[in-house]
Amino acid sequence: MLGFTEGIFLVLTVTEFILGNLVNGFIVSVNGSHWFKSKKISLSDFIITSLALFRIFLLWIIFTDSLIIVFSYHTHDSGIRMQLIDVFWTFTNHFSIWLISCLSVFYCLKIATFSHPSFLWLKWRASRVVVGMLWGALVLSCVCTMSLMNEFKIYSALTGSRDTQNMTEYIRLKRHEYNLMHVLGNLWKIPSLIVSLIAYFLLLLSLGKHTQQMQKYSVGSRDQSAEAHRRAMRIILSFLLFFLFYFLSFVILSSSRFLPETKIARIIGVVITMSYLVGDSLILILGNNKLKQTFVAILPCECGHPKPGSKRFFAS
């Protein structure tokens, strides 16, 4: 019989799972149909579509893990099932994070304006820089996943072991090492976090300076343009906060192995992770001109607002 905590957790995960698939499925269907009709796709649309697709895979993996936590928690960390979930979760999550970093760099190079020679050199080669990052992200994700698979050699020695008086000190040490490697696995995510933070900071700095300059001439179309800049800054800040929120969830999930209430910590980490996969994708829709127009067009009622898309800071 499910307890109160497990029941609330199950309701939240089912809701987030459905919403996440709808939101990310919408992105894939809109960009995919446009790609199919026009036979071409912009780099930003390709990254956004790939990100949404990987997030759908990640939602299914996390939802499967959530069901195991609720209905069969005592077998959560045992057997080939755990290994498969860990491998697929690691690859899809790591590559998704790098896709976010690539998207932030692309927006930064396309939108921000700085006179530094190094920035201008990168700006003129924005597409090539981001494509190179995508290939590098794929390689790093594979390496990260392979390093995790090496951990299973340790895990195989621990299968069936329990904390009993007969357990040798060697087995205890190996189990601690296995858990520690899971925590240290978060170090693979630090480079992508640094890249994203730098890109978001530069983009906010550039938009902030440009907005201040435009406010001096806040009449007519320039006033509308300044307001569009402020909306873009709010979207970027939302991206950044959600991204930091996402990293917090993985710190909680990884550290849960060393916390007294392991199950509660995992539940909190999973809920935060799935919330991010829904919320951040919604921000992607609101920040993209084409996706936002299509989203508003399918709403069942008129909201009394003008059609979006007067300014295209995140449009493809």
Swiss-Prot record:
Additional comment: Several bitter taste receptors are expressed in a single taste receptor cell.
Keyword ATP-binding: no
Organism per entry: Rattus norvegicus (Rat)
SUPFAM superfamilies (UniProt xref): Family A G protein-coupled receptor-like
Any one GO MF annotation of this record: G protein-coupled receptor activity
InterPro entries documented for this protein: GPCR_Rhodpsn_7TM (IPR017452), TAS2R (IPR007960)
Parts of the chain on the Cytoplasmic side: 29-50, 108-128, 208-234, 288-316
GO biological process per UniProt: detection of chemical stimulus involved in sensory perception of bitter taste
PANTHER family reported in the protein's UniProt record: TASTE RECEPTOR TYPE 2, TASTE RECEPTOR TYPE 2 MEMBER 3
Primary subcellular site in the record, as a coarse category: membrane
Protein name stated in the entry: Taste receptor type 2 member 3
Gene field: Tas2r3
